[in-house]
């Protein structure tokens, strides 16, 4: 069965696993999903993200979730731009999450990065998701 929004599927898997206290979560590999997971790792929302080779020659991404005092570090994980309604922002309109306490993950011409790095680089792009 094909998936209409693989990024939304990845975000929901992470959110659901964190809400029930799982130590890690796996989902099918794609370069975009790996880039998003690495941004989450660099921002300190997860411990690790690595590519795992499955036995049927398809790769998976395994994300090791992070908890603080028994509660998940990721409180908000929301898909913004979706297949039915894309959301693009120029460098001046890039959204801040919770007044700068969270991050927006942006797909730019220079790669997938946070809103603050996109402002530093002077580029806009598609707003993929909000994380806090």
UniProtKB/Swiss-Prot annotation:
Q: Which GO terms describe its molecular function?
A: rRNA binding; structural constituent of ribosome
Source organism, top-level taxon: Bacteria
Gene Ontology biological-process annotations: translation
Keyword terms of this UniProt record: Ribonucleoprotein, Ribosomal protein, RNA-binding, rRNA-binding
- The stretch of residues making up the signal peptide is none
Q: A GO CC term? A: ribonucleoprotein complex
Which PANTHER family does the protein's record reference? 40S RIBOSOMAL PROTEIN S15A
Q: What does this protein do?
A: One of the primary rRNA binding proteins, it binds directly to 16S rRNA central domain where it helps coordinate assembly of the platform of the 30S subunit.
Query: What's this protein's family per the entry?
Result: Belongs to the universal ribosomal protein uS8 family.
Can you name this protein? Answer: Small ribosomal subunit protein uS8
Q: Which organism is it from?
A: Xylella fastidiosa (strain Temecula1 / ATCC 700964)
